[in-house]
Amino acid sequence: MASSENEPFCVKFIKSPENSEYFFKAYEAIKQIQSDESLQLTEEREALLLKEKDKSLYICDPFSGAAFSHLKKLGCRIVGPQVVIFCMENQRRVPRAEYPVYNMAMADVTISCTSLDKETREDVHHYVQIMGGCVYRDLNVSVTHLIAGEVGSKKYLVAASLEKPILLPSWVKELWEKSNQRIIRYSDVNMTEYLCPIFRGCTICVTGLSSLDRKEVQRLTALHGGEYTGQLKMNESTHLIVQEAKGQKYECARKWNVHCISVQWFFDSIEKGFCQDETMYKIEPASTIKSVPDTSTPTGGNSKPNSRTLYDVSQISNISTSCVNESAFNSAMASRLDPPADTLENLDISSLQAPDDLLDGCRIYLCGFGGRKLDKLRKLINNGGGVRFNQLTGDVTHIIVGETDEELKQFLNKTQHRPYVLTVKWLLDSFAKGHLQPEEIYFHSSYQQTEMPSPFEPAINLTANKMSSTRDPLNHTRNHQADEDLLSQYTENNSTLIEDEHPKTSNTNSISQMSMHEDMTTCTSQSGLADTSTIIEGGLFSRKQFMVLGFLEEDEACIIDIIKKSAGKVLSSQKRAIADYAVVPLLGCEVESTVGEVVTNAWLGMCIEQEKLLDPHSNALFTPVPFLEGSTPLRECVLSVSQFMGAERDSLVYLAGLLGAKVQEFFVRKANPKKGMFASTHLVLKDAEGSKYEAAKKWNLPAVTMNWLLQCARTGRKADEDSYLVDNVPEEDKDESFISQTYKPQAIRLSMHAPCHLENHPEALTKAAVTPLDMNRFKSKAFQSVISQHNKNPQTSGGESKVLQREPSLHLDTPSKFLSKDKLFKPSFDVKDALAALETPGGPNQKNRTQSTPLSEVIGRNLQLAIANSTRQTAAVTASPQLKAAEKKEFDNSKLLINVVICVSKKLIKKQGELNGIAASLGAEYRWCFDESVTHFIYHGRQNDMSREYKSVKERSGIYIVSEHWLFACSEQQKRVPEALYPHTYNPKMSLDISAVQDGSYTASKFSADTSLQQDENSELQLQQNNKFGETSDDQVKKAAGDGNPQNPSKDVKGALTQTLEMRENFQRQLQEFMSATSVVKPRGSVGRAGFDNSPCTPEGARSTRNGRSRVLEALRQSRQAMTDLNTEPSQNEQIIWDDPTAREERAKLVSNLQWPDSPSQYSEQLQHNMNDAGGNYTPAKESLTDTEIAELEACEFEPKSAMRTPVIENNLQSPTKPDHLTPTPQAPSIAFPLANPPVAPQPREKPVQPFSKEETLKERRFQLSSLDPQERIDYSQLIEELGGVVIEKQCFDPSCTHIVVGHPLRNEKYLASMAAGKWVLHRSYLEACRAAKRFIQEEDYEWGSMSILSAVTNINPQQRMLAEAAMRWRKKLQGIKQNMGIAEGAFSGWKVILNVDQTKEPGFKRLLQSGGAKVFAGHSSPLFKEASHLFADFSKLKPDEPRVNVAEAAAQGVNCLKPEYIADYLMKELPPPMNNYCLPDAIPYVRVTGTGLSRKRKTSGDVSDVKRSRHY
């Protein structure tokens, strides 16, 4: 049997009695493709005769026995049968490994190990190699997974930073065990269960933390795989969390080389998901940190290098003065605002009686407190119903500061939404007076407040409180400036003199209008005026010269500091040089010098915020605002400003305050004096979107643009809101730029006393300079031929002549204006005529067509793409003015995808440029990297793709993940097609070509809207008819209303019918071909298919759910589309000829599942099937349906019923219409299978509406709201009251409530108590459905736990799902008992409970138990044991001096002595959990194991009915 070198390759199967079924399956598979000479079935004894290694491939199964060991010893190439099957199925080579490979479960996996003992590491290596994986000793870029025994090694930190999965060795063992049972891949095992815990191998000790923080660290450590110890032990403790670098533990830890880190390390590790590098959080002794003594003498270590050329001039005399005065100011402010130290220390909390919801909506972070002070403040916040945060996040609304903190300053400098930074006196005064105090008078002195909370004050002057105490620093500034003037005589020419000799105009508008990201608190004491000779190259204002005029001295110093930090140069007013910009207050001031542009501090602030130089004329707030002094036309108005941020928002708030208006953050309909809210009268915003805008429309309150405010300021009178509604803003008015920067006036003089001079500028100031387009620059012959033909035709259109009449008014600049050596010349071209020349000449139906020649389409798209790119790259340079189009078109290519922002996946990187170009030509924006502004993610992959990029995008709600073909379809069809038709799994070769059918229905629907609207002037009433019979988009309605040319109805209808019938034949032909390839019987029960012709057509383009359209019908359409998961994407017309069995089965499934989106009968069948399916196995088309869509699953039934009561639609489209009736929208013929008989409209399936019983109608509905946003609370509270309900505003559960509306199921008191009492626990979509029906409706389909809610809301975790199901289960159970027995039961009925828990938690437990019908004893004395049935105790939370119950004595008398966790688990789990698992340690000896887990007292109690006992089974 010894093989020679010339022996051919052979596959040998080693036969043994233990061979598995895979062995014979692999043999048969190879036998089909391998010749008999190269395939052998060998016995074990023959294999043992082999003397040396040969070239054969040996197939062994199992990897054991004498033959396997012999072959392995010789070094033969051995694989298992699973390897053969895997490689044949995946067309891969059999691995040439130096070791046997049993299966390919870990193919494509490369692992490296860290922190494992030698034996475990060798086991891991062995199993990985035997499963087809690769092993590296060192960590490199090829490694895909890291196997770790514990955290903290260098490999661990590098792998975590590279986001590589870090797993436990048990993952490899689990893969090996499962791969022995069946053929699997490593991805089939859930890796999340085997991820290395964050603190694996860490033994953590703490010092200096409060008791509550210590317990929190202990809990989280155990939760994340670490070990917590109270004592610091040598060779055991690995980490010591230190509050301050002192103490015995700290000193010992340093000696024993234990990591001494801050508590931030602990929480950052949890937040980022892996153990952080300890060196970044190391706590050093104070002596090593502070090595420089506190002296007034400047040293190199704590002062910035002086950039001036004269180094021998000392300025030391000025520094000490500023330091002393700044200290005096700080101490004065602190003494005024902060309470004495002993006030909080000696405060008796019990003396402060305040409402439970005093702090409702306040999210509070405590900073700079410790010990007893911190505990008292926590109790105050809990008692007042506030939410306390342990970490600084963007959700915090109030920060209460004790001692100053540098980390807090850094957070405030970075955050966009600054919370209130207050002293503790605000909290104490609020509790003492029983209502929230205004925050303005409690600002902390050490932290600057940039928001403007009160509209009554013109602005919060940053330094208003400093004026009386900082006179000396101001004098120092003047002296300092005098020194600068002296030194400037000897410096270079680029230094700048700053003088304050010209008179300042006092103005109430201070620098606080701007949202500055710089820290301005030291701009007066440590001003940067000495650095005026330094130019920071490449800064925002590099090579720009400024003048600062009209501000108070301290504000001026701050503005100068801001400009210089951005590389700008500041000139004095007496300098002869011409400044580029003069910065003035918002209302302007007199400018004597010659400057290029006069801008406001709002312009400066927004330039800093956006980090780019903005066009001064792109925003009305960038130039001085005309204001009629002394007028307050908005005295009775309460404004809310939305969608504006930073300096722009502050300026609007300031302006509104000057006009007499009140400005508040929340937009409310009713006043709430308790919370200091007024009833809003106006909403000022940018765009017609957002929750506040929807609320304004609902409440009929004006939603206006900021131009309304500017007009009020300009005229001194309240302007008409209808002229400034945000709905009426045309698209061309939304452009940012108004005046080209190429034109700059030589001198502009603005007077504070005559602000109306802005209106007297010449026309050149309001019209941009246009560079005419040179037609000779286009070399294309096709383009030149089109232009030449266009020039020969006389212009007859009135619209075009209008445009041409405007040409002579162009103001062209001479080359000396724009050909400057310091400025880049960027011309703008007027290409309107060129694009118009490419359009197809208009016909009789031109307004309904957008067809053009292929050549013009290509050229037009490329021109638009070039213009879009040019505009994007030159944002600072304004383009030519947009002239009105000669002929209004129904569609504009550049606005098809307006407000769409796309990002292309890395998988499609090669197509990214092409896809971005298509998107830009359709009016969309694109991003090279995914960010928060992206609305559509272009991706291609499988249904459950495991790529990190896909999962990260999928976690974000509201993002469309679509195929690249969606963009192609939008471009081809010249409309925004529905995203649901093009998911990321879309394959054009695997779908039917039915897109044309949708176009047909769209045309017919549009025609119906046109004709019916022309017959009746009441467009609003007709719109309601369209919503019922053929929902028409808003754009179509507007088009029809404005169309003055009469149409030919019969001609269009016949054309639509002919086109649709052709589509029907084509569609039918495809289906017949599919059906001929399969033997699947056509599904029965689809009687309603004959009713296609009368089914409502829903064009996908109509997306608005509030503007004249039923939100119920819209959400039903979307939700049904998601639930049935229709595969109706447009595709190419390809057919399969080869008879593949798998493909035939798939075609059969496609035919059986194929349904038309416009057929209500088929939809109802599929929906009914899905709703009745207990498993609920359907895949939603998107991550989670919106609340409104969920609401429509049931509420939509009202709309079809109302439609059925209206006059029946005639089948004959040509029939005359009675003049006294509105013409209903005719329906487009649908595509259906040919029927022998004429189509008959089926009777719609009506779900019988159960009328409310008399008792239910009369019963008052009392609601509680939980886990909702503040704006949602306000909106839903208003809705409930309008419908006749009552809203209970309590922080805790109220037994009188009948319904609780919950955002998300949480294991809190409100939710559990509602569950125990059998209340209705509803999703917020219930209220949306009630809003649509305008009355309270049945609750069943909107209850947490119902299939309609759980199937639609997919982003809940298992615990939330268990809570949701438990709520419905208890509600049904308790209501059933009430109906059958006539008695009101609770979940805890019959319980008699003794509580021995923490005093702060006892009221909550008591309310929870009592809501479920339990009787709770006051106290826990021994005589109560005879009556009690349950005792709940938690000694770990009790203080040493608090009394404790005698558990042993209670258990001896038959009381169930349990941990409090039993209460929640009893409610959540379907079967009551065994009491033995929750038994207190002292009661274990007395537990008698019974079938029900009940004690003797419960078993023998005669007063407990069978109904009560049945709950335990």
Curated annotation (Swiss-Prot):
List the residue ranges of the region (Disordered).
289-308, 789-809, 1031-1053, 1086-1109
Main localization, broad class: nucleus
Coiled coil residues, start to end:
none
UniProt keywords (A-Z) are: Cell cycle, Chromosome, Cytoplasm, Cytoskeleton, DNA damage, DNA repair, DNA replication, DNA-binding, Nucleus, Phosphoprotein, Repeat
Could you give a GO molecular-function term held by this entry? chromatin-protein adaptor activity
Comp. bias (Polar residues): 789-799
> Which compartments is it annotated to reside in?
Nucleus; Chromosome; Cytoplasm, Cytoskeleton, Microtubule organizing center, Centrosome; Cytoplasm, Cytoskeleton, Spindle pole
The entry's comment on post-translational modification says: Phosphorylation at Ser-1131 is essential for phosphorylation of chek1, and thus for checkpoint regulation.
Q: Subunit comment for this entry?
A: Interacts with cdc45. Interacts (via BRCT domains) with ticrr; interaction is cdk2-dependent. Interacts with atr in the presence of atrip. Interacts with recql4 (via N-terminus). Interacts with gmnc. Interacts with cip2a; forming the CIP2A-TOPBP1 complex.
**This protein's name:** DNA topoisomerase 2-binding protein 1-A
What organism, scientifically named, is this protein from?
Xenopus laevis
Q: Which gene encodes it?
A: topbp1-A
